[in-house]
Amino acid sequence: MSTSPAKFQGIAILDHKDWKNPKKVEYEPKKFLDHDIDIKIECCGVCGSDIHTASGHWGDITKPLVVGHEIIGTVVRLGDKCTSGLKLGDRVGVGAQAFSCLECGRCKSDNEPYCTKSVWTYSTNYEDGYNSKGGYADYIRLHEHFAIPIPENIPSHLAAPLMCGGITAFSPLLRNGCGRGKKVGIMGIGGIGHMALIFAKAMGAEVYAISRTSAKKDDSIKMGADHFIATKEEPDWATKYFDTFDLIVVCSNSLTDINFDVVPRTMKVGGKIVSICAPEQNEVINLKPFGLLGVSISNSALGGINEIKQMLDLVSKKDLKIWVETVPISEKGVKEVFERMDMGDVRYRFTLTDYDKEFFT
């Protein structure tokens, strides 16, 4: 039985040239399919991807653009062939992915984000041409596989940023052996970086927070960092930390400021440098030959559904608390977070809240 409306409402970008002035709109949701669910949204985290997409940094947009892929809400409709075990009224989270084929080798090996038929939660076309709409809205409709139950002891406003930013931080740590006895560097202590720091510490690693200046040193220590490196204030830092790291996760907004002539020298033989960076569309980096150092440089995108469940289990069992500021959703509220995100004025994530007041009164 459906308890969702025929049309959804959202706070949308109508022109990327005027992206900081979003407007409330009404729109048709995608066609409801047998394995789809509808979710009434409670809150939604604000991700850097929202800014890149809204501003046109990643290319032109299909309008109206409703961003948001760190969604927490309640299941209000289930398709006739749903088999995931979700029930009406369940609190679930949705991240950056709304669909994949679930049949290819990548999907069957828990690598859904790497499926060639992936549809992202917003600004991606389904096979029928419908352009997906995200979580700055009253409801969202998507395949049941990509809605994940949230443990009871994780508050919704803290759970939301985990669904994209959190798993983006957690996946490279999990896949690259973060744990006891390992020395792990987190480069870039922003929204994702601060979560990577908290996770790495909870996983048992010796954690080094790496930032350009010491401005975030106190915060990093409070988050659990064992060491702090300010690269601009310690010109010889790579020499000092030669042969130190098993893993460095690069969480910066851009790779152009990362000196790849220097960073590999800090790695142990067999060490891994993994970037989660998704910079502007026109960014290019040049890598010089970095010698016979036995170091790997790679990238990571999101994480599979099972990895998200493992992350939520870690957060729940360890009672981890990420640093979040809440802002009520509205045209004014979204404008505020866009402006502050663009200026870097956030410590360390935003969650849009008060959906009932904006959409359901």
PLM region spans:
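Rossmann-fold dehydrogenase core element
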Residues: 272-274, 285-326
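Adenosine-nucleotide cofactor-binding segment
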Residues: 180-189, 201-261
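N-terminal Rossmann-like NAD(P) cofactor-binding module of classical short-chain dehydrogenase/reductase
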Residues: 93, 248-249, 274
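Glycine-rich beta-strand-centered segment in the early N-terminal region that forms part
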Residues: 28-44, 57-108, 149-154
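C-terminal hydrophobic helical "lid"/dimerization subdomain
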Residues: 2-6, 261-262, 305-361
